[in-house]
């Protein structure tokens, strides 16, 4: 599986001229990369693709497994200073780690990831998104800006397609822009769709202790995970023009990681 994923990726990179050999690692990308030295592991964080659980896993790898994954709060895992970003090291070390460590990134169907981001960030009450971002969206699309009605999926999509891809929030920025897989040669290209298999493969590759399992914790446990059916329900709210525009926005993600726009 890995070989075919890597082959597809490499040929799409070439065909679309996405390789920038010899250029300096983009600091935005270095910010998305987490380093775990004990097992020489680098993980690229793609939000909405099981990243909280990968961060929990890195935390456990570092801490000799003396805690349970379920004890690590969602909020804490994203604000801990114990998990180091590649960006916090000088460029020479960044290079060294990138050449010697096992590098991993996970992807998810672009439409499913988009719906998951909308459900998680705009339908829940995380103040930055449900207030700040939501108000920015309301201001763009509503005549009556005082209305406190939740931002609709259509408004959310219009908001995203109105911006340049590079400037998008990491929760909905195209995955290839977050992790630069054409220049960083990931050793494992995992998929959310085959998360169990792929995470076992990663843990074996980095020689993790056998007792460590990738956790399947979920932040809002009462809700269904965003799956294909839920994604379709949301996509049906969009016009064909909007769908064409999000296809275009995530076009490289579809090609590089071999997802179909079904």
Ranges and model annotations:
Residues 1-262:
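Membrane-interface amphipathic segments in extracytoplasmic regions
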